[in-house]
């Protein structure tokens, strides 16, 4: 436990940030799951719409530093490839 006043404030701020980051990570994962679910169901339009909603959220969190930019690019690349494959069939 912190004894210095500024250290106590820092621990409170750190806890608030941790909660916010966890919430945002959860939101991002939920959107990714929606895209994966739509792809696995085989619904072309639903998967494309879900992907369009997911993309700006992932980009936003990558620019803010919640996830690494390469991880964001990887998510988008893999899911867009699967959607393109779904549209070919």
UniProtKB/Swiss-Prot annotation:
Example GO biological process: translation
InterPro entries attached to this UniProt entry: Ribosomal_bS20, Ribosomal_bS20_sf
GO molecular function: small ribosomal subunit rRNA binding; structural constituent of ribosome
Regions of compositional bias (Basic and acidic residues) in chain numbering: 7-18
UniProt GO cellular component terms: cytosol; small ribosomal subunit
Residue span of region Disordered: 1-27
Keywords for the protein's UniProt record, in alphabetical order: Ribonucleoprotein, Ribosomal protein, RNA-binding, rRNA-binding
Pfam families noted in UniProt: Ribosomal_S20p (PF01649)
Functional summary from the UniProt entry: Binds directly to 16S ribosomal RNA.
Family recorded in the similarity comment: Belongs to the bacterial ribosomal protein bS20 family.
Protein name: Small ribosomal subunit protein bS20
Gene name of this polypeptide: rpsT
